[in-house]
């Protein structure tokens, strides 16, 4: 009987694990904060315009900070904001300032990678023009690291994401999307900006891309919002961190609409969805009942 219970327990938990999905927040080119399930990007459940930014400022990227699980946004004028995931209200917390001169730093480029390094709790900002910054979001103090580089060529980095993004972190790696070579790259060492090719995405993407990695149970899953050349909207894809291969999940679009949204960046909520937790609770309750009956 104990063996039977163990098998049932494994089956229930396996079902919960396989059905688990992630809550994804996206930043559109119209400064909308959208929300959808990683398994069904065609069913965007929420779309609110971001408000509370400085006049004429727009957001260039977003990410969840592992140390407090809050969503942060980087403004085009170099301001750092926290974002309310329910109503998209932006609250300014800092401005990017050079750690040596204490002068404001201008962002260079049209597309940016924005992601928290979970080990030192610093925000990495990369750009398609090679900018490479480390930001203390509590103070705005920023280190201008080495320009992004790759041998004799210039990479075109449009999305960045760290692995093992739980707090406190001990080890991590920084992966990037390069829209010029259509490659997944590893930035190693990160502060030097050196790009090492991991492998081809297998798709021809534009510079409009968002990238994020979520870590649960010590497992890293990578996702991206990518715009294919010749298309207007964005598609949601899984990224294989071992090979670089992108696998399309679907268009990112509102429910009951065939029009895809143009998405600049994505950030995956590190906290499991309530539905997933309810499913897990139901599974454990079922196991408990079976044990009592036995």
What are the residue ranges of the model-derived segments?
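Gram-negative bacterial Sec-dependent N-terminal signal peptides
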Residues: 2-19
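N-terminal segment immediately downstream of the Sec signal-peptide cleavage site
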Residues: 21-60, 65-68, 242-248, 253-254, ...
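Conserved beta-propeller blade signature
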Residues: 23-27, 70-73, 122-125, 169, ...
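Structural motif
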Residues: 32-35, 79-82, 131-135, 181-188, ...
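Short loop/turn segments that connect beta-strands within beta-propeller blades
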Residues: 38-41, 84-87, 137-140, 189-191, ...
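Beta-propeller fold detector
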Residues: 44-54, 91-99, 142-151, 188-204, ...
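Structural signature of eukaryotic scaffold interfaces centered on beta-propeller domains
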Residues: 60-67, 104-120, 156-170, 207-218, ...
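A short, hydrophobic C-terminal helix/tail in secreted or cell-surface proteins
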Residues: 272-289
């Amino acid at each position: 009987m104990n063996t039977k219970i163990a098998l049932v327990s494994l089956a229930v938990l396996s079902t919960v694990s396989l059905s688990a999905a992630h809550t994804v927040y996206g930043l559109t080119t119209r400064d909308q904060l959208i929300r959808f399930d990683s398994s069904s990007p065609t069913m965007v459940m929420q779309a609110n315009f971001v408000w509370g930014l400085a006049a004429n400022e727009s957001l260039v990227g977003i990410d969840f900070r592992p140390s407090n699980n809050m969503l942060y946004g980087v403004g085009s004028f170099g301001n750092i904001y926290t974002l309310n995931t329910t109503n998209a209200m932006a609250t300014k917390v800092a401005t990017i300032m050079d750690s040596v001169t204490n002068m404001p730093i201008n962002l260079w480029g049209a597309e940016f990678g924005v992601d928290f390094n979970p080990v030192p709790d610093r925000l990495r900002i990369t750009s398609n023009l090679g900018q490479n910054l480390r930001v203390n979001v509590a103070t705005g103090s920023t280190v201008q690291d080495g320009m992004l580089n790759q041998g004799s060529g210039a990479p075109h980095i449009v999305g960045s994401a760290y692995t093992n993004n739980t707090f406190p972190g001990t080890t991590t790696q920084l992966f990037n999307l390069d829209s010029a070579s259509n490659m997944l790259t590893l930035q190693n060492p990160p502060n030097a900006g050196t790009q090492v090719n991991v492998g081809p995405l297998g798709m021809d993407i534009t510079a409009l891309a968002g990238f994020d990695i979520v870590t649960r149970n010590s497992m890293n899953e990578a996702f991206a919002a990518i715009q294919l050349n010749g298309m207007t909207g964005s598609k949601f894809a899984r990224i294989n961190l071992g090979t670089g291969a992108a696998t399309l999940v679907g268009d990112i679009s509102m429910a009951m609409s065939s029009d895809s949204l143009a998405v600049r960046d994505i950030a995956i909520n590190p906290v499991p969805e309530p539905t997933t937790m309810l499913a897990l609770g139901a599974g454990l309750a079922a196991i408990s009942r079976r044990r009592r009956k036995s």
